[in-house]
């Protein structure tokens, strides 16, 4: 890992203020503790003293490839009870992780926690795989805000991860906060100081798949293009879903989305 690109909690001081956080995180508690679909199990992974993160594991097969997935800022893991079967049907095990304050997780969501917690989550996820004798290869995936923790893990553990998948990801935190209408005077120079995602992409050389909606107005397609162009991966692919926006990308592009995902995981698993 390139130490020059590593972030410390002090780096997030400008971001982790209530007047900024309220524009970014929308925590919601899980009203359904038990999964609504077969072959799904809830897990709690400790990430800090007194704080555990809720995850939901959807099993296709013990030998299938495994995706550790970070969702968007308005979602919780149990929402994927309706989507995960599409992943398992193409032969992929999916583990969806929450953030602090989301689902059944403890704590309060912050930028610092969002970037720190993926490391113990990754260790906990690997423990789940070992304990259950799930032998497939490991991938990381992030949607929207979740692109940041996914890229953090891909950047940090390339020798353990077979591939990175980004859906509707953002290139830099400054541009993201602009799009979320965070008042500029509350951020100072943070736009230049913390680029979050794009700064790590040249150092990530594992296979990378980027999926983005053509008409995404929340995180415009240019973010996906920038991440793709900045990637240091020898194998990389940008899939643009025609006619799709931020929140209907899976529905509109389901066939192309799942086909690309299956091809990517199979080809690099």
Per-range role (PLM):
Residues 109-131:
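Alpha/beta-hydrolase active-site loop
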Residues 215-219, 246-248:
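Acidic catalytic loop of the alpha/beta-hydrolase fold
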Residues 204-205, 210-212, 216:
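Short beta-strand/loop motif that positions the catalytic acidic residue
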Residues 1-46, 54:
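An N-terminal hydrophobic leader/cap segment in hydrolases
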Residues 87-106:
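Conserved alpha/beta-hydrolase
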């Amino acid at each position: 890992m390139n130490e020059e690109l590593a972030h410390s909690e002090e780096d997030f001081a400008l971001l982790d203020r209530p007047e900024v956080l309220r524009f970014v995180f929308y925590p919601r508690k899980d009203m359904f503790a038990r999964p609504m679909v077969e072959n799904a199990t809830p897990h709690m992974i400790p990430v800090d003293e007194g704080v555990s993160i809720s995850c939901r594991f959807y099993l296709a097969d013990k030998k299938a490839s495994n995706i550790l997935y970070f969702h968007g800022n308005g979602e919780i893991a149990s929402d994927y009870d309706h989507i995960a079967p599409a992943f398992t049907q193409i032969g992929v095990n999916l583990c969806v992780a929450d953030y602090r304050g989301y689902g059944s997780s403890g704590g309060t969501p912050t930028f610092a926690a969002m970037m720190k917690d993926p490391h113990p989550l990754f260790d906990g996820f690997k423990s789940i795989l070992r304990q259950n004798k799930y032998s497939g290869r490991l991938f990381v995936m992030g949607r929207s805000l979740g692109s940041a923790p996914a890229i953090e893990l891909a950047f940090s553990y390339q020798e353990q991860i077979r591939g990175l998948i980004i859906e509707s990801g953002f290139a830099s935190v400054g541009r993201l906060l602009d799009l979320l209408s965070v008042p500029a005077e509350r951020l100072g120079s943070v736009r230049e100081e913390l680029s979050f995602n794009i700064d790590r992409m040249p150092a990530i050389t594992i296979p990378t798949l980027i999926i983005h909606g053509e008409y995404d107005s929340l995180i415009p397609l240019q973010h996906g293009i920038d991440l793709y162009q900045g990637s240091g991966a020898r194998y990389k692919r940008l899939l643009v879903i025609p006619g799709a926006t931020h929140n209907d990308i899976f529905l509109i592009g389901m066939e192309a989305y799942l086909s690309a995902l299956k091809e990517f995981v199979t080809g690099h698993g």
